[in-house]
Curated annotation (Swiss-Prot):
This is Heat shock cognate 70 kDa protein 2. Residues 618-644 are annotated as: Disordered. The keyword Nucleotide-binding applies. GO terms for molecular function: ATP binding; ATP hydrolysis activity; ATP-dependent protein folding chaperone; heat shock protein binding; protein folding chaperone. It comes from Solanum lycopersicum. Keywords: ATP-binding, Nucleotide-binding, Stress response. GO terms for biological process: chaperone cofactor-dependent protein refolding; protein refolding.
Length: 644
């Protein structure tokens, strides 16, 4: 068990568009379906005037409620508002994003009639809560521990922010691992029994919103990431968009009307396009039918696989570039790649498979693992290893992750001096001795950067600190040892020490990059609890309302039944009918009443109806038992007694 008998640990693939959860059970990984029966859950959170929706329920209502339905939180997490990628993404989102304190992007929605602001961590934590609940419903126990995946080139603050999201959701994130590493584990488990010697594996992960290519070597259960490349803005949604644009033009031609100004029409068209795209992976042609798409006009059309491929051909070809870059970075020829693994739903597209297969000179691609589930599968295996759940089958897997970007510091003239080159296996530690730039310099400023450019101004500043108190000396004399230390989770510690005086200073690179403070996390954890209890309240309310509705309609049907009606006095019958009418009218006017009010109404109605019905049954001498339903035993009776 997870260290202290804390129940099973789960693996979560927290995706840009969809998420997936798995658990190690009975010596194998079980990918868990949600309450809708789907093995992947949309990474969507919707806010309405009465409730909060997560997953399928949120995505299903996005057409009616676009500005209060949040998705793509993964594109915001661990980034600053002023970040160029955030600025360009914002243009595409229907929901509002504003700069919060410390340049942190905040998502603004209307919830229960009030304006609320959420950070990306909070939205992601809501998706994580959903995944946790899916696992708990399946396992029948509470789940505390999880392994969560991030893209291979997520930087430090994105990893850290993902961990924070876990904390807010009430999960202990045992480890953050790279998605391709997770896919390789899933794959490695299948293959480990037979493999001898080193294997080179290329992971081709084309998801809903992002595209990642990674090259790994696997030897005797040891995974090493050699190189990563990709495009953070290429995925299934782009293919959907091409189809959407194609049909928007068609609608314009046919009807002389432009639907682009109508978000609901666009959303309905996009949903239909996503469905059509999936269908085209297995058939050559499909139809799109949308009733009353815009201004009452129905839209019917067909699209062939060939047309779909033509609309996206440039994008499909673009998918091959990172594959070449990855091989170049790893200094490897494509002929030395043993296996090519497909991950992500978009790798089901036949054209993508064909282009990739052609690139590797006709090599068979590995498709044995469901591409949507491979990452969660690997995360679940890793969770089992870390919690000591797994058996010997998995215990001897060892994970070596890498740094996605080079790490270094700024030296005189704004030059980037790299201490840890990218694709270095972590955990790792590097030391280097530096000195002062001018005579009698009293201190040095250590500025830590990540990136591949030679000038620091083109790279990303992670943090800085000062080492002061250096005794006066000519330039180049003082010896300052700088140490970069990355742990298994990819968290970076940088320290500097003056050899002569023993003066020391250090920084842990997590905090000043839009990280949440302890207090903020605490607050968010409490809020998450609050929202959860509100969701529970809402559920109670709906149940009480349904119980009352059921009872009223059942009763109405009961007294319409000839056998029963004939045994009621006209007076009693009118009494019941009036009471039911009143109850139904009250229901129509009070859909948002509190659970107690529904329950009180129910009691009122019961106390009037039940004695009359009971009297009738006694009068009938009990020969009615097996005939018309006795409403108190009907849809709603016993359910209610338990409540009060």
């Amino acid at each position: 068990m997870a260290g202290k008998g804390e129940g099973p640990a789960i693996g979560i693939d927290l995706g840009t568009t969809y998420s997936c959860v798995g658990v190690w059970q009975h010596d194998r990984v079980e990918i868990i379906a949600n309450d809708q029966g789907n093995r992947t859950t949309p990474s969507y959170v919707g806010f309405t005037d009465s409730e909060r929706l997560i997953g399928d329920a949120a995505k299903n209502q996005v057409a009616m409620n676009p500005i209060n339905t949040v998705f793509d939180a993964k594109r915001l997490i661990g980034r600053r508002f002023s970040d160029a990628s955030v600025q360009s993404d914002m243009k595409l989102w229907p929901f509002k994003v504003i700069p919060g304190p410390g340049d942190k992007p905040m998502i603004v929605v209307n919830y229960k009639g009030e304006e609320k602001q959420f950070s990306a961590e909070e939205i992601s934590s809501m998706v994580l809560i959903k995944m946790k609940e899916i696992a708990e419903a399946f396992l029948g126990t509470t789940v505390k521990n999880a392994v969560v995946t991030v893209p291979a080139y997520s930087n430090d603050s994105q990893r850290q922010a993902t961990k924070d999201a876990g904390v807010i959701s009430g999960l202990n994130v045992m480890r953050i691992i790279n998605e391709p590493t997770a896919a390789a584990i899933a794959y490695g488990l299948d293959k480990k029994a037979t493999s001898v010697g080193e294997k080179n594996v290329l992971i081709f992960d084309l998801g809903g919103g992002t595209f990642d290519v990674s090259l790994l070597t696997i030897e005797e259960g040891i995974f090493e990431v050699k190189a990563t490349a990709g495009d953070t803005h290429l995925g299934g949604e782009d293919f959907d968009n091409r189809m959407v644009n194609h049909f928007v033009q068609e609608f314009k031609r046919k009807n002389k009307k432009d639907i682009t100004g109508n978000p609901r029409a666009l959303r309905r068209l996009r949903t239909a396009c996503e469905r059509a795209k999936r269908t085209l992976s297995s058939t050559a042609q499909t139809t799109i039918e949308i009733d009353s798409l815009y201004e009452g006009i129905d839209f019917y059309s067909t699209i062939t696989r060939a047309r779909f491929e033509e609309l996206n051909m440039d994008l499909f070809r673009k998918c091959m570039e990172p594959v070449e870059k990855c091989l170049r970075d790893a200094k490897m020829d494509k002929s030395t790649v043993h296996d090519v693994v497909l991950v992500g739903g978009s790798t089901r597209i036949p054209k993508v498979q064909q282009l990739l297969q052609d690139f590797f000179n006709g090599k068979e691609l590995c498709k044995s693992i469901n591409p949507d589930e491979a990452v969660a599968y690997g995360a679940a295996v890793q969770a089992a290893i870390l919690s000591g759940e797994g058996n010997e089958k998995v215990q001897d897997l060892l994970l070596l992750d890498v740094t996605p970007l080079s790490l270094g510091l700024e030296t005189a003239g704004g030059v980037m001096t790299v201490l840890i080159p990218r694709n270095t296996t972590i955990p790792t530690k590097k030391e280097q001795v530096f000195s002062t730039y001018s005579d009698n310099q009293p201190g040095v400023l250590i500025q830590v950067y990540e990136g591949e450019r030679t000038r620091t101004r083109d790279n990303n500043l992670l943090g800085k600190f000062e080492l002061s108190g250096i005794p006066p000396a000519p330039r180049g004399v003082p010896q300052i040892t700088v140490c970069f230390d990355i742990d298994a989770n990819g968290t970076l510690n940088v320290s500097a020490e003056d050899k002569t005086t023993g003066q020391k200073n250090k920084i842990t690179i997590t905090n000043d990059k839009g990280r949440l403070s302890k207090e903020e996390i605490e607050k968010m954890v409490q809020e998450a609890e609050k929202y959860k209890s509100e969701d529970e309240e809402h559920k109670k309310k709906v149940e009480a309302k349904n119980a009352l509705e059921n009872y009223a309609y059942n009763m109405r049907n009961t007294i319409k039944d000839e056998k029963i009606a004939s045994k009621l006095s006209a007076d009693d019958r009118t009494k019941i009918e009036d009471a039911i009418e009143q109850a139904i009218q009250w229901l129509d006017g009070n859909q948002l009443a509190e659970a107690e009010e529904f329950e009180d109404k129910m009691k009122e109605l019961e106390s009037l109806c039940n004695p009359i019905i009971a009297k009738m049954y006694q009068g009938a001498g009990g020969d009615m038992d097996d005939e018309g339903p006795a409403p108190s035993g009907g849809g709603a009776g016993p359910k209610i007694e338990e409540v009060d």
